[in-house]
C-alpha cells in the first residue's frame, strides 16, 4: 500500500467511495486514522451493510455529490478512478470543489491511470507496438464512452493547473503489473 504521509488522527475523505471497500481496507492497516466515505445518498445503505462493526467508530459515510462544493475539512482527499471517467471540464469542476477546504499541507491523492509516453523527444518508440495499440484502444474506449481520454502525466499537470497553480504533483507511484498509479498532490497555500 502506498504510504502518503500518514499521520495519526488525521481525517481521510474518499470522494466517490461507494461501499467503502478502500477506506475499510486502509482502516484495517492504519488503526489511528479516521475515514469518511462520501458518495451519493443511495449508496449509504450498501455502505452500512459492508462496514465491519469494529471499524464503525473510525469509518463513516456522508452523502455527498462531488459535483457540489465540499463540506468537510479533511487532511487527505482520496479519489480512486473518479476523474478517469470525466472530461477535463468536469474533472476541473470536481477538484475545484475541494479548494475552499484545502489548506497548506493538505493532500489530494488520486488512484488513476497515468498513460505512459509512447515516444521519446526524438520520435523513437519507447514502448512496444502491441502496448501502443492497447493504450490507443483504451483511449478510444474512453473517448466513445465518456468523451475523455486516458491522461498522461503532462495531462494531469495541465488539469491541476486549470484548477489552481498551487496544486502540485509531489509524487507518482506506479507498480509493476498495475494499471493504476498513485498521484500524490500537495496544496501550496
Regions found by a protein language model. Name each.
Residues 2-189:
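Alpha-helical subdomain
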Amino acid at each position: 500500500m502506498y504510504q502518503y504521509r500518514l499521520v495519526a488522527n488525521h481525517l481521510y475523505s474518499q470522494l466517490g467511495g461507494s461501499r467503502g471497500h478502500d477506506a475499510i481496507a486502509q482502516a484495517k492497516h492504519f488503526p489511528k486514522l479516521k475515514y469518511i466515505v462520501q458518495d451519493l445518498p443511495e449508496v449509504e445503505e450498501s455502505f452500512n451493510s459492508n462496514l465491519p462493526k469494529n471499524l464503525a467508530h473510525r469509518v463513516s459515510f456522508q452523502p455527498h455529490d462531488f459535483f457540489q462544493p465540499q463540506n468537510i475539512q479533511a487532511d487527505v482527499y482520496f479519489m480512486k478512478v473518479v476523474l478517469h471517467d470525466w472530461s477535463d471540464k468536469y474533472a476541473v469542476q470536481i477538484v475545484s470543489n475541494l479548494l475552499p477546504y484545502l489548506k497548506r499541507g493538505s493532500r489530494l491523492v488520486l488512484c488513476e491511470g497515468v498513460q505512459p509516453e509512447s515516444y521519446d523527444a526524438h520520435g523513437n518508440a519507447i514502448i512496444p507496438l502491441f502496448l501502443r495499440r492497447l493504450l490507443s484502444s483504451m483511449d478510444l474506449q474512453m473517448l466513445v464512452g465518456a468523451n475523455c481520454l486516458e491522461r498522461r502525466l503532462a495531462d494531469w499537470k495541465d488539469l491541476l493547473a486549470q484548477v489552481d497553480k498551487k496544486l502540485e504533483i509531489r509524487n507518482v507511484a506506479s507498480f509493476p503489473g498495475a494499471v493504476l498509479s498513485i498521484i500524490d498532490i500537495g496544496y501550496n497555500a
